[in-house]
């Protein structure tokens, strides 16, 4: 399953949400409770979502031990927490605020659910590829002046490939001296 393991946690028990996507987990939790905490891995990782569930009237401070010190120190408000994408909590005090936050969290979880699992990879060319140009652009004036023939272009490419390094320069000088 592409989403990895999902967990529903409560202070009393912890059970695995088997074969359920984060979106389905979110729908499942709202029928049971009014306080929901979603804790994601780093922003670029779409392979794992943890859902931490608490019953009604549970104070936010009671789940401090589940959160890292870094998350707690950066947590200033519910909205900043949502923007970070690391932690999302929904207080049950105000129904209007709760429904607005529910919409935001639904979109976050949906994004996590449909996002591609691949991570971008960057291929760095080796030094030999970087030193030799693949394409040389030449301009041809309308009157034909300064036109470079194909032989000139090939010679320029070969000359660039044969750039003298200190070692090659020493060898070339010693060879010329021996002649």
Swiss-Prot record:
This protein's UniProt keywords: Host-virus interaction, Inhibition of host innate immune response by virus, Suppressor of RNA silencing, Viral immunoevasion
GO BP: symbiont-mediated suppression of host innate immune response
Source species, domain of life: Viruses
Role summary: Pathogenicity determinant. May act as a suppressor of RNA-mediated gene silencing, also known as post-transcriptional gene silencing (PTGS), a mechanism of plant viral defense that limits the accumulation of viral RNAs.
Entry similarity comment: Belongs to the geminiviridae protein AC4/C4 family.
Name of the protein: Protein AC4
């Amino acid at each position: 399953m592409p989403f990895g393991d999902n967990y529903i946690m409560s202070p009393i028990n912890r059970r695995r949400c088997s074969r359920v996507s984060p979106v389905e987990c979110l729908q499942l939790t709202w029928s049971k409770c009014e306080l929901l905490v979603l804790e994601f891995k780093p922003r670029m990782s779409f392979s794992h979502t943890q859902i931490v569930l608490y019953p009604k009237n549970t104070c936010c401070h009671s789940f401090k031990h589940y959160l890292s010190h870094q998350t707690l120190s950066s947590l200033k408000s519910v909205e900043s927490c949502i923007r970070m994408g690391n932690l999302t909590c929904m207080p049950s005090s105000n129904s209007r605020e709760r429904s607005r936050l529910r919409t935001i969290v639904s979109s976050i979880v949906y994004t996590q659910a449909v996002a591609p699992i691949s991570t971008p990879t960057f291929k760095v060319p080796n030094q030999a590829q970087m030193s030799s140009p693949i394409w040389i652009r030449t301009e041809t004036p309308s009157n034909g002046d300064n036109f470079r023939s194909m032989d000139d272009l090939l010679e320029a490419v070969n000359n660039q490939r044969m750039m003298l390094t200190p070692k090659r320069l020493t060898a070339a000088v010693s060879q010329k001296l021996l002649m």
